[in-house]
């Protein structure tokens, strides 16, 4: 009887965790057998934005497809870096050719606002957010199709 109850609790926890991961909309890399982070998709999907922990597209990363919102980047779970939230951690990004991203300095879409949009024919690569003043300062974001950037 006790085992049945424990199994039920574990199953419930697993379903809740799975639902939470799906609701964030984040797709992160999984480590390979050697514990290394796999390469970033190349080419990146036309309708996606990839965010990197370090400049020059290095370190851990996660990918959002268009029409995803995250009002608090502390809520993203990336399997290879589970103990680190992404609030104030993004240092470079790549925007798929049919995508755009709008981001804010504070959670809940408050504070200073910035954005990047690809031109429809090629990926927009931003190797460093240091110069634009956004390095490790993004706390919430929205991704959209390039044609809907103004609606962010």
Question: Which residue ranges define each predicted feature?
Answer:
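Bacterial N-terminal signal peptides that target proteins for export
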Residues: 2-13
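Compact beta-sheet-dominated domain cores in extracellular/mature segments
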Residues: 2, 27-152
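Bacterial N-terminal signal peptides
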Residues: 12-24
